[in-house]
Amino acid sequence: MVVIVISGPPGGGKTTQARRVAEYFSLRYYSAGMIFREIARSRGLSLEELSIIAANDPSIDIEIDKRTYEEALKGNVVLDGHLTAWIVSNIADIKIYVTAPLHIRIKRIAERDNIDLNKAMHETIIREYVQKKRFMEYYGIDIDDLSIFDLVINTEKLSVEKTFNIIREFIEKFLKE
């Protein structure tokens, strides 16, 4: 049984890569971000609005973290989430961080969510500020400290395919050991 975590900031490429890894290695896929989006949608809120609410209501993060941890315990899974590597660090076999500079991530988010660049920038900056503060306050986790990761990749100059090949080779080497 293997547990692989792919983390990173919004727009860094974690979801794209996590899905590809899960498919390639025939593993289950689970996204903490999708759960957060489901909660926002069910409450009729934007991600920005739910992030602000979550800053004062730890029950949202607690529920997401509980569900994420339960999925990790089942094994044979690729977990995708900004905080996931810290939440399941004691059972994750491989922890990978994918990122890109802010301007690249904002462009990707605008394209993915079909919104203009200014809105993507506004929402992303607020979301990241609130998340960083919330994660430190609730968990004592500095999400800028990447020392827990086995592999860190800046995807700015890499295609989706090249990024995947780096990740795939890293995982294959780990699985052979």
Curated annotation (Swiss-Prot):
<feature type="binding site">
    <location>
        <begin position="8"/>
        <end position="16"/>
    </location>
    <ligand>
        <name>ATP</name>
    </ligand>
</feature>
<protein>
    <recommendedName>
        <fullName>Cytidylate kinase</fullName>
        <ecNumber>2.7.4.25</ecNumber>
    </recommendedName>
</protein>
<dbReference type="InterPro" id="IPR027417">
    <property type="entry name" value="P-loop_NTPase"/>
</dbReference>
<dbReference type="InterPro" id="IPR011994">
    <property type="entry name" value="Cytidylate_kinase_dom"/>
</dbReference>
<comment type="similarity">
    <text>Belongs to the cytidylate kinase family. Type 2 subfamily.</text>
</comment>
<keyword id="KW-0418">Kinase</keyword>
<dbReference type="InterPro" id="IPR011892">
    <property type="entry name" value="Cyt_kin_arch"/>
</dbReference>
<dbReference type="GO" id="GO:0036430">
    <property type="term" value="F:CMP kinase activity"/>
</dbReference>
<keyword id="KW-0547">Nucleotide-binding</keyword>
<keyword id="KW-0963">Cytoplasm</keyword>
<dbReference type="GO" id="GO:0036431">
    <property type="term" value="F:dCMP kinase activity"/>
</dbReference>
<dbReference type="Pfam" id="PF13189">
    <property type="entry name" value="Cytidylate_kin2"/>
</dbReference>
<dbReference type="GO" id="GO:0005524">
    <property type="term" value="F:ATP binding"/>
</dbReference>
<dbReference type="GO" id="GO:0005737">
    <property type="term" value="C:cytoplasm"/>
</dbReference>
<keyword id="KW-0808">Transferase</keyword>
<keyword id="KW-0067">ATP-binding</keyword>
<dbReference type="GO" id="GO:0006220">
    <property type="term" value="P:pyrimidine nucleotide metabolic process"/>
</dbReference>
